[in-house]
Amino acid sequence: MERWSRRKFFLTSLASSFAAGASKLFGKEVQAGNGSNARAENFALTPPAQGVRPLIISSANGVNALDRGMEILKKGGDTLDAVVAAVMVVEDDPNDTSVGYGGLPNEDGEVELDASVMHGPTRRAGSVASVRRIKNVARLAKTVMERTNHVMLVGPGATRFAVAEGFEEMNLRTEKSRLAWLAWKASSSFNWRPGIDSPEWKEHMAALLDTPERQALLPWIESVIAHPPTGTIPCMAVSEKGDISATTTTSGLAWKIAGRVGDSPIIGAGCCVDNDVGAAGSTGKGEENIKISGGHTIVEMMRKGMSLTDACLEALRRVARNYNNDKKKLGTFHLFYYALNKNGEHGSASLWRSTRNGRRANYAVHDGTKARLAECAALFDEASGDE
């Protein structure tokens, strides 16, 4: 009972600090690419072209990375090379805490990464999960596809395979993510330093954030403690010839139980490609997507003639049905779907129109002219009730 009271106190007393909580998918700041911070207002929120090839799309936090993938597509490169190269920009960026280097750790303070790839032309797939100390797990999933007759490798075995294939082991935790984890431990434990409702909380945080640079992180730290991010980057592309590939890469749910695996590495859930039809991917609460095999559901709806946006909305309806459309329960999480088809058409839908702070859901599209943000459709045309 004491622990629940602490959390309720934390959520209510720090509500004004939560503006950063969903910035990756909704917010003003979209962090990606070469350590730079790209603000969403720098990207025109106008409808990108439909029916154009080549085309590459991703979640909003990939908007700065799509140029890299489009360069490959315009040179006639393989679609899987394009999407993996694009997400590696984000995996390499320590400022993006949703994937790769700098991703927020599990409850033990270890960064665990998941990823999957699907190659439409050869109808192959590769996947890795619960990988530690390897930064570019999308490329690792591609290596599993290319160098083994398996589809998925997990845990220490995946790390050993990566090292054998020449991947560099490294500490994936940055100072920023370490401080956030220490603060989370303090706010979530009975005995491991003062709780948020303790008189010693401010003193403890002052000692932890002992420089102006660290103190500037406090609003963000409080936000990610209250709303553990589920950030991810799915990316999919169609070539001029109509070939399709996709990848999804993530550091998963922040503060998760060690070994937890979400939907990102699950073929048919977080990533699905059929070269005859199209591709779909997701971000948000992976457990909900796994239960409906969302990626596969969307591709099959597209095969039956449903529009991309309607297919994404149908997947969200199936998620909502699992909760009898109870908005109070559904309001405790977010879920987003992204899709493109063989003709170069694209679409996306989110469970909620916006966060409770009013930020609307977007996704990133590059149609060969420039990368831009497009607005997601929404199952529920209102703000999330997420607390």
Model regions: which residues?
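Alpha/propeptide regions of enzymes that mature by internal proteolysis
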Residues: 2-4, 11-18, 33-387
